[in-house]
Amino acid sequence: MLKKMPSLKARQLIRLIESGGCEFYREGKGDHKLYVRHTDGNKRVVPIDMGEREFSPPYVLRILRQFGFTDDEINELLR
């Protein structure tokens, strides 16, 4: 079961996903940056809007889900 998801600033979200094994992939259009996570031979590329001041809890969860993190992995990252 997931802990309560916090709202995060862009730099906090980047630190969180990088600690989970994600890497910077390339610059996207506008304020977006693309990050990649390699799992089981799959490559998941997710755009993150760096122009936002603070990301809402549902947005943070959606980003983590797009990378393929499980509930247990998300709880471990949020410790």
Give the location of each predicted region.
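Basic nucleic-acid-binding interfaces
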Residues: 1-29, 34-79
